[in-house]
Amino acid sequence: MAQHVNLQLGDKVADFACGTGGFLKSAYDVLAKQTNDGKVSDLQVLNSSFYGVEKKPLPYLLSVTNLLLHRIEQPHIVNGNSLSKNVDDYTDKDKFSVILMNPPYGGSELDIIQKNFPSNLRSAETADLFMTLIMYRLAYNGRAAVVIPDGLLFGGGNKRAIKERLLQRFNLHTILRLPTSVFAPYTSIATNVLFFDRLSKEEEQANKGWSTKQTWFYRMDMPQGYKNFSKTKPLLLEHMKDLEAWWNNREEIIVDGFPKAKAFTPDELKQLDFNFAQCGFPTVEEEILPPDELIAQYQAKRQEQEAIVDKALANILALINAKE
């Protein structure tokens, strides 16, 4: 994700649910390569580039430790709830040029937290609120990459309002559909990555329609030979080669009659009632045979297996008799 948000030295990078600081560390790895041979001013800029918030005490401590170990001498990590402030109270100084996040999903928030958001964007679901928070805290010309669950893609109600606002106010240029097991063994929830940018102040003020011109959807299929990812068989960089090749040379891809990559305009997505669950994973339908065909198949298979067993027994008996 950090490689696809055009990180530049001087960017202010934020993660409002930073966990152990993995995304901030990834951003550091990208920006550290842009420093000039240990130039003091570059290192000072680099050290002041990262901001994180973590609600839980243990991950908070681990995130601070993680950044310290990677030579970020003054980690700007806060132990708290990013959702506890009214989004209308944020000013330009509270906004960031890059936001990288994998917000918690499956959780729910109290009414007092939900009231910090506009009524049409309110939700008890934590991931929805973080998605709205990101839209309020991304600076002009800012870039964001956010992991979100499938529920937001096809959901209606407040989820629909969030998606419509995203297309109206931001350039939602890419949605990456991830395999279900990509975060195994930590979660089996199907996830996606949304990549979007905010326009410049001048462009935003002049814009009268959709800020998004088109949104590309790309389905990342399982590598050949893999049924799923796991702790012992994790997602590796080499598995991303097809995605990397496509990213800079985008074109529609059809596999076995199903779209793997395809672009949609905001008007087309509106006609689909803002259903972002496009270029999904094909489902293999199992053919259910009539009972007589199933019985016939079973009997044929049974006879085949019995013949194999009979042949093996005959060979064993022949060996025994030969020794006698």
Which residues are covered by each model-predicted region?
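Conserved S-adenosyl-L-methionine
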Residues: 2-101, 106-108, 124, 128, ...
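A conserved structural/catalytic subdomain of Rossmann-like adenosyl-cofactor enzymes
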Residues: 79, 85, 91-324
